[in-house]
């Protein structure tokens, strides 16, 4: 695989779980650095090679290549306890984490964030969002309210006072708003100091480092988390995550300028999935959903929750392409559709007897959208061993071609199985 780019952004173009980790791992074989720019350990990126499956939640997916610098950017939120546990887990699998670095400007997740996340979700009753309860939202809320504590604050001479003041403030919320017992200072503080000692030598100025790499003509891969349809501003609000998931945030979340981003690849699953609450017009309510769920192993990598299954929604995909700045697409879990005689794709919505071609802003309107389908012939053939686009059955080729025609964005490649080797480029600029 050749590469003519200095910077490449990989984003999810649906509701997350598209297989970004696998594709990031694939491109990281030629990268000098992989940088996470948003989210926290609510992500669950799965990478499979040498008959072994690995998961990373906050560490970039390039960690499996020892030659790659893996940087956790300033746009993320970091639970040091989770990060240290992930480092230990990788080390136990003989995977070095000496190449993992952390932005000094990244905000931290503490025990009070995870507790408040849980209490808020319980308080929503029937209006639950489906949060992972890992403290992501409350940490970003503190960042916006300027209560947040950053990695760089850990070395401040008065950090203990800063920490206590922050804990006291949150204990007021925990006890008086939610009637829950307060958190203990000593336990949380001592654990934090222990974990800080384990990572302090890997803290860097992310923007300075990444800008220098690009200016030196190194190849930097920016790894997104979740998906554009979960973006806090442009996703299906309020059933979204707490950060910006589009390529627009790759520069903000790493400390470089927007002109340093050259290309954006959107990862799209061959069908739709969604975790938690929120509308999904193409959701399948028949036994077929269970069949596809089992074939695609569609269970949350962090929570184990079964994912909701739907036909590929091209209205939502076109929206994600526009909002996410996507130049090319990469199709994943293509083989999951191998056994289907007929395959549907959604090309428009019907809302109040009108045909619309974009996602409405209002969630209640989105819930009322009816999908308008185009039906394609399936291929009913195992494609897991093919190694080129030309080897695909004609109907599988037609599936890719028809999507391209409708969304007017080309496919860079596709995946026909979980292993790194089952990733195939369509002829183009990345060919050897």
Swiss-Prot record:
Binding site for GTP: 16-22, 44-46, 307, 333-335, 415-417
Note on cofactor: Binds 1 Mg(2+) ion per subunit.
Cofactor(s) required for function per UniProt: Mg(2+)
InterPro entries, sorted: Adenylosuccin_syn_GTP-bd, Adenylosuccin_syn_Lys_AS, Adenylosuccinate_synth_dom1, Adenylosuccinate_synth_dom2, Adenylosuccinate_synth_dom3, Adenylosuccinate_synthetase, P-loop_NTPase
Subcellular location: Cytoplasm
Keywords, sorted A to Z: Cytoplasm, GTP-binding, Ligase, Magnesium, Metal-binding, Nucleotide-binding, Purine biosynthesis
Binding site for IMP: 17-20, 42-45, 132, 146, 226, 241, 305
Binding site for Mg(2+): 17, 44
EC category name: ligase
UniProt cross-references to NCBIfam families, sorted A to Z: PRK01117.1 (NF002223), purA (TIGR00184)
Family membership noted in the UniProt record: Belongs to the adenylosuccinate synthetase family.
Subunit structure of this chain's protein: Homodimer.
PANTHER family given in the database record: ADENYLOSUCCINATE SYNTHETASE (PTHR11846:SF0)
Descriptive protein name: Adenylosuccinate synthetase
Gene from which this protein is expressed: purA
């Amino acid at each position: 695989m050749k590469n003519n780019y200095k910077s490449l952004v990989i984003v999810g173009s649906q509701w997350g779980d598209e297989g970004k980790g696998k594709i990031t791992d694939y491109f990281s074989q030629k990268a000098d650095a992989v940088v996470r720019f948003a989210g926290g350990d609510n992500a669950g990126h799965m990478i499979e090679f040498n008959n072994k499956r690995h998961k990373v939640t906050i560490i970039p997916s390039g960690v499996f290549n020892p030659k790659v610098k893996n940087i956790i950017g300033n746009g993320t939120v970091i639970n040091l306890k989770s990060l240290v546990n992930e480092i230990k887990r990788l080390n136990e699998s003989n995977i070095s984490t000496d190449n993992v670095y952390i932005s000094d400007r990244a905000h931290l997740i503490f025990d009070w964030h995870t507790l408040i996340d849980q209490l808020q979700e319980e308080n929503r009753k029937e209006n639950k969002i489906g949060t992972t309860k890992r403290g992501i939202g409350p940490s970003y809320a503190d960042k916006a309210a300027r209560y947040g504590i950053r990695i760089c604050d850990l070395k401040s001479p008065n950090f203990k006072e800063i920490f206590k003041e922050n804990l006291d403030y949150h204990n007021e919320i925990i006890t008086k708003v939610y009637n829950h017992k307060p958190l203990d200072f000593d336990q949380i503080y001592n654990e934090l100091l222990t974990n800080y000692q384990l990572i302090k030598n890997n803290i860097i100025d992310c923007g300075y480092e990444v800008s220098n790499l690009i200016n030196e003509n190194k190849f930097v891969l920016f790894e997104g988390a979740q998906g554009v349809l979960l973006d806090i501003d442009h996703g299906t609000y309020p059933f979204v995550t707490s950060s910006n998931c589009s390529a627009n945030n790759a520069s903000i979340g790493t400390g470089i300028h927007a002109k340093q981003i050259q290309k954006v690849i959107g990862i799209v699953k061959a069908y739709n999935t969604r975790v938690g609450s929120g509308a999904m017009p193409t959701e399948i309510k028949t036994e077929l959903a269970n069949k596809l769920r089992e074939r695609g192993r569609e269970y949350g990598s962090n929570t184990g929750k079964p994912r909701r299954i739907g036909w590929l929604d091209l209205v939502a995909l076109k929206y994600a392409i526009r909002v996410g700045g996507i130049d090319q697409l990469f199709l994943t879990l293509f083989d999951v559709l191998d056994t289907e005689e007929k395959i549907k794709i959604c090309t428009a919505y019907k809302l109040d007897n009108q045909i619309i071609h974009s996602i409405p802003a209002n969630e209640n309107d989105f819930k009322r959208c009816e999908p308008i389908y185009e039906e394609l012939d399936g291929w009913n053939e195992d494609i897991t061993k093919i190694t080129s686009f030309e080897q695909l059955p004609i109907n599988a080729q037609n599936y890719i071609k028809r999507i391209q025609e409708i969304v007017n964005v080309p496919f860079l490649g596709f995946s026909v199985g979980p292993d790194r080797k089952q990733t195939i480029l369509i002829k183009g600029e990345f060919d050897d």
